[in-house]
Structures are given as structure tokens and as C-alpha cells.
């Protein structure tokens, strides 16, 4: 994969933390990155072009932009990638490896990938879980994160961990429990949804009605703030997160009801 990084300059500061979102259905990581860019008033310092992708241009206030843009806050020491379209799965591994090569060259201290999972228990909580290399486990515990006890990590999250382990950049996968993904899991466990296609249709419909999981995004923003040792005003996310939890529950309740009754229900929307 030919990947070009066009950048105006990144100070070689060992306090810099690279934050990326791992594309997953709840979009919590994507929302967290967007919120950090806006709230920290991050400066656009470059962009990434993937040569093998069909041309995709993002338009911002009339200006043509590449779909993967690099933002930086010198004060916070946070570098992040704003993704206007998801990185295609078939190029994700190369994308991450070359991004981490660039991070190493620029003396970035740490790289974290943000993602979300269904609740590990009956309901989701406020904990943020992590997977990192063995020598860093105690440090991430000290940040207040919970280690994932036992799991097999595959997909895009697995590609990130495979790429970051053993590098000079410290790396970790951070995951928050998602109300949306928990609700979908409840639905599949109920036996009312049988196929992967049906799950994706319901998931897309739910996201269309209630939006990405801002509750999980809030947990991820707070996690980044702890890692970077900065203050981030999350009041806008907090207000939206409480409304979001209510909307997800009401929509899932309607789907779980017997069909005759569910037909009379109007799904809750903003």
C-alpha cells in the first residue's frame, strides 16, 4: 500500500500521544476523536493519502480536503487522525504500520487506539479496559484502566496491536462498554435476530435513529485526558449521553416486544 503523509511539521516532543479511532459499529472512537479535535481547538498539520483507494475528497466550508487529516494540540500534546471515511479493512494493517513508522520518526511517546465492546457483565459500566504489551500493564492499571483478563483480539483492533507491539512507541488498545452494542447483543441473545445481515440492518437503523454511542465516546475522551494528563471539558457530551442511553433502551424495548404490539409503537427519535 502506498501511503503518503503530507505534514507541515510536528515538534519532536516525547510527551506527544497519538490517538486514533478503530472503526467499529458504535462509532464511539470516531466521536471521541471528533470531540477532542473541536474541544482542544486542535490545529490541522497534515493529511494522509492512500494511493490504492478510489479518490475520496472531503469538503469543509468549500475547501477540498483529503479524507484522513492529522490534527495536533501543542498544549495538550495530542496528535490525532480525523477520518472522514473509514479506512478500508484490506489496507488497515499497512495504514497502521506506516502511521506508526511516522510516529516513531517523530518521537511520539504513546499510540492508543479507541474502540468499544458490549458490556462484559449484565449492564455496561464506566470502566475503560485496555490491552497492551506485558511491560506496560501495571502503568495502565495506575491510570485507572481495567485489563481485559482473557480474550482473542482479531479484526482491526488485532491489526493495531500486532503493529504496535515491540516498537519504541508505547501502544495500547482502549475499549469502553457501549450501550448500543450491549443492546444489540441483548437482541441477538433473545433469538429474535438470526442472521448477521439482520443484525447489521438493525444496527444501521438504530444508528440512524439515535446516532453514534456518545456515552462510550465520553468514557474514551476521559481516558485520553488521563493519559495525556490534561483537562477536557466534557459537559456537552455528558448532557447528550444521558439522553442517548434513554433512546437506545426505548428503541430496543420496542424491538423486543411481540410483533403485534411493536407495530403500534413509534420508535423514539430526537
PLM features per residue range, with description:
Residues 1-79, 85-94, 98, 104-106, ...:
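Accessory terminal and edge-of-domain segments that mediate assembly/interaction
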